[in-house]
Amino acid sequence: MNENLFASFATPTMMGLPIVILIIMFPSILFPSSNRLINNRLISIQQWLVQLTSKQMMTIHNNKGQTWTLMLMSLILFIGSTNLLGLLPHSFTPTTQLSMNLGMAIPLWAGTVFMGFRHKTKAALAHFLPQGTPIFLIPMLVIIETISLFIQPMALAVRLTANITAGHLLIHLIGGATLALMDISPSTALITFIILILLTILEFAVAMIQAYVFTLLVSLYLHDNT
């Protein structure tokens, strides 16, 4: 195992060049289009998951919000697949990098805010000042609402980064403890190994849940601005 606890989060390189782009593009291979594979089990599962998720997320949207369906479904598939691939041994999880998550969160958030100011200008501006606010609290509330608006993409990115990173660190620590206890106390090592298996199963669920939460929050931001 790596001596450095955070070595697995370092950006991988090949011949001195970062290969993050190749890693990010790899999930697209896992979801081939139906033009190449017809009546394939993978395609059937993919379509069923997309339809189920789109029904849950997009029913609250109007016609303008429905135009984001393809983007949001692509987003949840991308984040979910990269999270799951990161659980494989000796692999790299791009979503543990805050810079990448900010690169996804900021443009999506900015797009929803832009739509709000473009199509519902008065309603978008009204969010900065709740109805019935006392006059002496108006400047403070405007500042607070402005800060809360700009914190939204940071919260999206930090939530995804923290949850995925914490899970990987726990797996790393428990895996290291299991190896260290094999020679000292095999019975204790067996217990920690069982805990490691259960934690890994939990991390598979967390990987999908975090992809769903990230996409759902973007969908809610979109709903507030359309």
Curated annotation (Swiss-Prot):
Q: How does it sit in the membrane?
A: Multi-pass membrane protein
Residue ranges spanning the membrane: these are 12-32, 68-88, 97-117, 135-155, 164-184, 189-209
Reaction(s) catalysed by this chain's protein: H(+)(in) = H(+)(out)
For this UniProt record, the keywords arranged alphabetically read as follows: ATP synthesis, CF(0), Hydrogen ion transport, Ion transport, Membrane, Mitochondrion, Mitochondrion inner membrane, Transmembrane, Transmembrane helix, Transport
Family per similarity comment: Belongs to the ATPase A chain family.
Describe the protein's quaternary organization and the partners it interacts with.
Component of the ATP synthase complex composed at least of ATP5F1A/subunit alpha, ATP5F1B/subunit beta, ATP5MC1/subunit c (homooctomer), MT-ATP6/subunit a, MT-ATP8/subunit 8, ATP5ME/subunit e, ATP5MF/subunit f, ATP5MG/subunit g, ATP5MK/subunit k, ATP5MJ/subunit j, ATP5F1C/subunit gamma, ATP5F1D/subunit delta, ATP5F1E/subunit epsilon, ATP5PF/subunit F6, ATP5PB/subunit b, ATP5PD/subunit d, ATP5PO/subunit OSCP.
Name of the featured protein: ATP synthase F(0) complex subunit a
- Provenance organism: Equus asinus (Donkey)
The lineage, from the top, is: Eukaryota, Metazoa, Chordata, Craniata, Vertebrata
The gene that this protein is the product of is MT-ATP6
